Amino acid sequence: MDRIVIRGAREHNLKNISLELPRGKFIVITGVSGSGKSTLAFDTIYAEGQRRYVESLSSYARQFLGVMDKPEVESIEGLSPAISIDQKTTSHNPRSTVGTVTEIHDYLRLLFARVGQAFCPECGRPIEKQSASEITDRLLKRPPGTRAILMAPLVRGRKGEYRKLFQQLLKEGYARVRVDGVIYLLEEAQGLSLEKYEKHDIDLVIDRVVLKEEERPRIAEAVELALLRGEGLLRVLYPDTGEEELFSEKFACPEHGSVLEELEPRIFSFNSPYGACPACSGLGYRQEFDPELVVNPELSLAEGAILPWSRGRDTGRSYLWDRLRALAEHLGFDLKTPFKDLPEEAKRAVLYGLPEPFEVVFRRGGKETFRVEVRYEGVIPWLEKRYQESDSEGVREALEGFMSLRPCPACGGTRYKREVLSVKVAGRNIAEVSALPVREALAFFQGLEKTLPPFQAQIARPILREIVERLGFLVDVGLDYLTLDRAANTLSGGEAQRIRLATQVGSGLTGVLYVLDEPSIGLHPRDNQRLIRTLKRLRDLGNTLIVVEHDEETMRAADWIVDMGPGAGIHGGEVVAQGTLEDILKSPQSLTGAYLRGEKRIPVPKERRKGNGKWLVLKGARAHNLKNVTLRIPLGRFVAITGPSGSGKSTLVHDVLYAALAQRLMRAKTTPGPYEALEGVEHLDKVIEIDQSPIGRTPRSNPATYTGVFDEIRDLFAKTPEARKRGYGPGRFSFNVKGGRCEACGGDGTVKIEMLFLPDLYVPCEVCKGKRYNKETLEVKLRGKSIADVLDMTVEEALDFFQNVPSIARKLQLMVDVGLGYMKLGQPSPTLSGGEAQRIKLATELGRKATGRTLYILDEPTTGLHFDDVAKLLSVLHRLVDAGNTVVVIEHNLDVVKTADWVIDLGPEGGDRGGEIVAEGTPEEVALTGSPTGAFLARIPEIAARIGVAAD
C-alpha cells in the first residue's frame, strides 16, 4: 500500500475530515495557529500508530508503557509504527548529556576500554599489566649479554628496623638483599641498625642473570618467583648502566601502587559507581551553601544580615545569637556595622567559624560574673549540619533557597574518578574528549586511526566508524557547536529535537512513520538547508515524514503539503488544500498559498522608530560562551536579537540581562551570569519575560482565569436578582471551592476511572454532565445564560455577549486582537499550544495600565505561528512599543527581524566560535555589514531597494 488513508477524523476541532497521504514521502502540514495541524499529526496519526504498536504487545508489557487513547477517527489504513520527535520531551535528568542521548558516549566508553592507555595519576608513567612470560620476553629484547639483577620489592617507603625480616629471609635460603639502594649479603644486613623512624626500601635479590636466549628457563623462573614474593611487582637493576625498571603484573603503577581496575566500558561511565566521582556521584556539581545568598551585605549583623537566622534574632535569647555576640566581643567588631564594612577576618569567622575555642566573660551590672569557654562553628557549617540532619522536607526546601550549584572540587566538574581520567587515547582522557565542540571532536576522531599502532587501529576501526557517523549527523542538523558533556536539561526545545532527529538518522531504521513538530525552531536561516538535507536523508532511507511546519523553505522542499484551516479553533479543522507545492500555489482558498505566491506579505515599516533617546547598557557579559560583550539596547524601540544557533543570544538576554534586571527592579531571587555593569536601569519600572511555558498545569486553569476576566464575570453573576435573592456571592460561581461546584467531580467536570491494562478513562461527570457546577448554581442566569454556558463560549461569542460591559469587553477584545477569538473561555490550560499560551500572556500584558517604562523580553515568539499569525503578533508587539515600552525579541524569523527598529546580530558562529556582537543598527544598516543575519536581510526586496538607493 503506497498511501496512508485517513477517514472521519474528529479529534478536538477536526470536522470529520478524510484525506490520503503518500507513504515514503516528506509531508508538511501547515495552517494558522489552532487550525488542527498538531491534532491531525500528533493526536490522530501518531497516536493511532503508537497505539496499534503497543496493542500488539502482551498485557504485562502494556502496563509499563501507558496505552494511548484511541483517537476519534473512523479508520486509518497504511500506518507504520510511529515515532514522534517533538519539542516537549527534553530530559530533565541531570545525568543526561548530549553524549548519552545520542549514544556517542557508549561508543566512547568502548573505545577507551579497548584502546586506552592507562597512566599513573601520581607520576604520569604508563601503567601496563604484563604476565610473567611477557616480562621475560621484554627482558630478552635487551642486547644479548646484558647483566641484570632481578629483585622482589618487599618494603616500599615504610618505617621500621626489619631485623626479623632479614632473619626470616636467611632461614628461607636467600643470599642477598638491597636496602635503601645498597646490596648486602643477608648476614651483613642482620647487623645493620636501621633508623626505626625513617622510611626504608627493601628489595630481595632473587637472581643475578645474563640476558640471553639460552638462559630463558632460568630467567623465566626468577621472574615468576620475584612476582610471587613481590606481590605482583618485579624490580630489575642493570648494574653496568645503573638503570632500573619496575614491572607489574597487575594494572597498577609499580612506583606508587595506584591500582586501576581492568579497563572495562563500565568504568568510563559517570552513571556507574565504578567510574563516577565519589564526591558528587557523577553529577559534576554539588549543591553548597552560597555566602552571597546567605548574607545581605548591606545590613549589619544586628539588623539581620544573616538571612537564614534573621528570624531568631528578635528574642535576643537565641542560642546562635549569643554565640555571635561572643564572637564579636572576642574579635573586637561591632554588630551594628554593615556586613560589607567588616574586616575580612571577621567576615570569614562569622561564615566559617573559628578552629579553636575562645573565652567569653559574662558581666552583670558592669561586674564580671563568670567566664566560659565557647566554640563558634560558623553560619555555613551550622546550615550544612542542619540540612544533613533534618527529616523535614519543608526545612530542607527552605534551606535549599540559600544554596547554589558549584562544580565539584574533587573531580573539577568532569564527573569521573581520578583513576578514570588517567586513561588516555591520543593524549586525551574521556572528559577532555567530551568537552570538545562536536565540530572539533569530529576532526579528532577522523584523524585518530592514523595515530594508533596497527593492532589497536584494527580494534578501534568499527568503533570509530560509529562515532564519526553520529558526530556527522549532529553537524548536519546544525549542532556542531555543542559539546558532548553538555547537560541535556540545558538545551532549548529546538536543539533537543534536532539531537533526537540526528539520533534517529543514526539508527538507520526504515519503514517508520516519523512525526516532527517544527524542527526549524531556533535555527538560523543559513542552517536551514542542512536540516532539510537531514530530513530528506531520513525519507530516502524508506521512511514517511510528517512535519508540522511554518517555515517557507521547508514547505518549498516538501513532496506534499496539507494546508489546514481556514481559521483557528471552531473556524478551522478542515483541509483547505493539499498536494504538491504547485497545487498549493494554484489554490485560491489556501491562505498559505497566498503568502507563498507573494500576494499577501508582512510589510516592512516605512519609518524606523527613533526611540526616546535613552539606552540600557549591559557591560562585560561573560556567561557561557559570551566574550566580554557590551549590549546596548535603545529604549522605546522594537529590538531584535539575532544570530546563528548557539551564538549566545539566550545566554545574553535570559541568563544575564533579564536575571540582572529582575534582581534590580523586581527584587527577584535570580542569579545573573557574570557581568561588569548595568547602566540605564533608572529609565525602567519593570521587566517582563513572556515565554511559551504553559499558563497553568492543571485543567482548573483556563484563559478566563489567567486573564482575570473570570473574576469580573463571577461578580456580574453575583449581582443578578436571582443570585441576590439566594444570597450567592462571587465565590458561589467558582468551580475551585465548595459551595457552587459539583461535589461529585470536585468541579473538574470529569471523573477519572482507573483501568488496569488500559489507559485511565476520563468520563464526563454523571451528576453535572461535565458542566462543573451544581444544579442550584446553574439556575442563576445572566441574559438567559448560566455560568457554564459562558465558559463554553468562544472569546468572539463572549465579546458579543459582554459588549456592554467595558471592563470585560476590553480584555476579550485584546484576546481577539492577538488572534485568539476562536478559543473557548473555559478551555483547560494543558490543552493550549505554546504559541497560544504566549499570546494569552501578551493579551494580559496589553490589558495592564501602561507606564510606558516596561521592558518586554520574548524568546522566539513566532514558534508555532503561521505567516498570518505572525502578522497579528507583530501588530500587538508594535502596540506595546507605541505606548513607549521597549520590546526585545530573540528571533530567526526574517518577517519579524525586518520590521524591527534595531537589530543586534551575534556570531559569527555558534558555541566557542560565537559570543560576540558582529553587527548592530537598523535592519538596513545590518544588511550592509554582510553579517550572518545581514546577508539574509539584504535579500528582502524592500530592504535591498533601500540599501541599493542608499548605496547609489
UniProtKB/Swiss-Prot annotation:
ATP binds at residues 31-38, 643-650. Coiled coil: none annotated. GO terms for molecular function: ATP binding; ATP hydrolysis activity; DNA binding; excinuclease ABC activity; zinc ion binding. Residues 309-591, 611-938 form the ABC transporter domain. Disulfide bonds: none annotated. One of its GO terms (biological process) is SOS response. It comes from the Bacteria. A zinc finger (C4-type) spans 253-280, 742-768. CDD domains: ABC_UvrA_I, ABC_UvrA_II. One of its GO terms (cellular component) is cytoplasm. The keyword ATP-binding applies. Its main location: cytoplasm. The keyword Repeat applies. The UvrABC repair system catalyzes the recognition and processing of DNA lesions. UvrA is an ATPase and a DNA-binding protein. A damage recognition complex composed of 2 UvrA and 2 UvrB subunits scans DNA for abnormalities. When the presence of a lesion has been verified by UvrB, the UvrA molecules dissociate. NCBIfam families: PRK00349.1 (NF001503), uvra (TIGR00630). Belongs to the ABC transporter superfamily. UvrA family. This is UvrABC system protein A. It comes from Thermus thermophilus (strain ATCC 27634 / DSM 579 / HB8).
